[in-house]
Amino acid sequence: MTNIRKTHPLMKILNNAFIDLPTPSNISSWWNFGSLLGLCLITQILTGLLLAMHYTPDTSTAFSSVAHICRDVNYGWFIRYLHANGASMFFICLYAHIGRSLYYGSYMFQETWNVGVLLLLAVMATAFVGYVLPWGQMSFWGATVITNLLSAIPYIGTTLVEWIWGGFSVDKATLTRFFAFHFILPFIITALAAVHLLFLHETGSNNPTGIPSNMDMIPFHPYHTIKDTLGALLLILTLLALTLFAPDLLGDPDNYTPANPLSTPAHIKPEWYFLFAYAILRSVPNKLGGVLALLLSILILIFIPMLQTSKQRSMMFRPFSQLLFWTLIADLLTLTWIGGQPVEHPYIIVGQLASILYFLLILVLMPTISLIENKLLKW
C-alpha cells in the first residue's frame, strides 16, 4: 500500500514541501533562516493572540491594560516580553536571510525575491503599528513622526495623513485602526510566506557555489529537518535568554511613560531594527527627499536582480565583491548606530556619508567590480 503522505491531498502538499523535497546537499547554515522565520511568525501569532485577549485598544486604557497584562495575568509579563523580543529575533533572522540571498545570488529567483521584498515590507508595517499599541511616549511620538512623513507628498499629503489618523492628530481612532492592522497583517504575512515557498519550490533552492543544484540533491527529511531543529533550538535559547535576563535591553525607557501629546521626548527614535532607514531619512535635509531616500533604502532590493553584472551567481569565488559586501554590512551597522544618536555634529556628517556610501555600493560599486572580475577571469 502506498504511504498516506503520498496519496492524501493535503498530506501530499506537506510531503512535497517539507519531507520528500529535493534539496541541495551542500547548503550551509545560512539556509536555516527561512525555517527560523517561520518559527518566529508562529511564535508572534501565538503570543500576540494571548496578548490581544487582555489588551484594550483605547487611548484611556491601552497603557494600563499592558501594565495589567504584566502584573495580573498569569505569566503575562513573559508573554509580553516574548512578543516584544520575538520581533527583534524576527528582524535578526530577516536581515540574515536577505544578507544570505545577496551574498549567494539567490535573488536571481526573481518571483521568490519579489515576494520576499513584499514580505519584508509587510513585516516592517506590522512592527511599526505594533510599536504604537502600548501607548507609551515613544509609541505616540513615533506614530506622529512617521505618519507625518506622508504629508511630504505634494498636493494630497495633508489630507492623506488626516485620513490615516482618523482626525487632526494621533488619537483614539488611530490607535483602534492600528490595532486592527496589527491583528490582520500577520495572517497576510502567512499567506505571502506560502506564496514565497510556492515560488521557491518551482525552482528549487540555490546553493553556496551558485551553480545549478540539480546534480546532487538529497531529501529534505531527515537531513535538513534535523539541521533546522538545531537552528530552532538556538533561536529559542537566544529568545528565552533575552526575555528572561534582559527583557528591556532592546526597548526604549521612554515607552514606560504614558503617552503625553504635550511633552515631546528628547530623542524620538524607532526600534533598533528601523534605525538604519531612520538614519538615511534624517541624512537628507529636505523632507520629501528624505522620505524618498527612506523608501528607496528598502525598495532598492527590487532592483538588485537587474544590477547583476557578474557571470557568476554567487560571491563565493569573487573576493573583490566579498570585500564590498562586507563593507555594505559595516555601512548598515554604522547607519544603525547613527540612527540612535542625536542630530548633532559629528553624527550628522557621518550619517550623510554612510547614506551616500549605501546607495553608491549597491547601485555603482558592486556592479562595476563584478564587471572587473569578469575581465580578470577573461569572461
From Swiss-Prot:
Cofactor: heme b
SUPFAM superfamilies, alphabetized: a domain/subunit of cytochrome bc1 complex (Ubiquinol-cytochrome c reductase) (SSF81648), Transmembrane di-heme cytochromes (SSF81342)
InterPro entries associated with the record: Cyt_b/b6_C, Cyt_b/b6_C_sf, Cyt_b/b6_N, Cytb/b6-like_sf, Cytochrome_b, Cytochrome_b_C_euk/bac, Cytochrome_b_N_euk/bac, Di-haem_cyt_TM
Entry's Gene Ontology molecular function annotations: metal ion binding; ubiquinol-cytochrome-c reductase activity
Residues reported to bind heme b b562: 83, 182
Binding site for heme b b566: 97, 196
Major subcellular location class: mitochondrion
CDD domains xref list: cytochrome_b_C, Cytochrome_b_N
Coiled-coil intervals: none
Binding site for a ubiquinone: 201
Keyword Mitochondrion: yes
Role according to the record: Component of the ubiquinol-cytochrome c reductase complex (complex III or cytochrome b-c1 complex) that is part of the mitochondrial respiratory chain. The b-c1 complex mediates electron transfer from ubiquinol to cytochrome c. Contributes to the generation of a proton gradient across the mitochondrial membrane that is then used for ATP synthesis.
The protein's name in its UniProt record: Cytochrome b
Organism of this sequence: Orcinus orca (Killer whale)
Taxonomic path: Eukaryota, Metazoa, Chordata, Craniata, Vertebrata
